[in-house]
Amino acid sequence: VPFNDVGESTIESNKEKYHYSYSDIIDLLNKNKKITNIDETISIFFDMFIIDAFIGNFDRHGANWGFLKRNNKYIIAPVFDNGSCLFPNLTNEDEMIFILNNQDELNKRIFKFPTSQIKLNGRKSSYFEIISSLRYKECNEALTRIFPRINMNDIFNLIDNIELISQIHKQFY
C-alpha cells in the first residue's frame, strides 16, 4: 500500500496534488492509528532517506514507498522503486568524463542534485541541504545508524565486478 493511500488526515482527499514536507510525513505517521510501530516506521523512513541520498534517488515520493497491510494494520514495506538512482538518464560517456574532470560539475551532483521529492519551504530540497542542516532529529539518528554500515571498499568491488558496464561507468559510479 503506497504511503499516499494510508493517510488518516484532512489532506487525504487531495493527496494526488499534495506535496509532502518532512514535517508532514512525520505528523501523518504519528497520527496514523493503523501503523503498528510508529517510531520504527519513522526511523526506517529516514534510513531510506539516507540511502536515497547516497544512491542519488530523485524519485522517492508518496507512491513509491509504503506499507504491507494485514488485518487492517500497516507495517513499513521493504524499500522498492530505486530505478531513479545513479543518474539513469546519464548514458553519454563523454558527459560522464566531463563531469569526472570538472570539480564544479561533481559538486553540483553532490550538493545540489538530485533533489528529494519531499518539500522543504515549499520546494524540492537537496539531500545535502537536509542532512547537513541537522534540522530533523530522526534524519540525524538515521545518518548515525547508516553511515558506519557503508563500506566503500565493498561498494567499489561490487561495481568493479559488474561485467556489463564500461570502465567509464564504473569510475562515474
Predicted regions and their residues:
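ATP-dependent phospho-/nucleotidyl transfer catalytic cores
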Residues: P2-F49
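Short, exposed beta-strand "edge-strand" segments with a Pro/Gly-rich flavor and a Y/T-containing core
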Residues: N14-Y20, D59, T144-I150
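Active-site acidic catalytic loop and adjacent metal/ATP-binding pocket
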Residues: I44-N82
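C-terminal catalytic region of ATP-dependent kinase domains
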Residues: L68-Y173
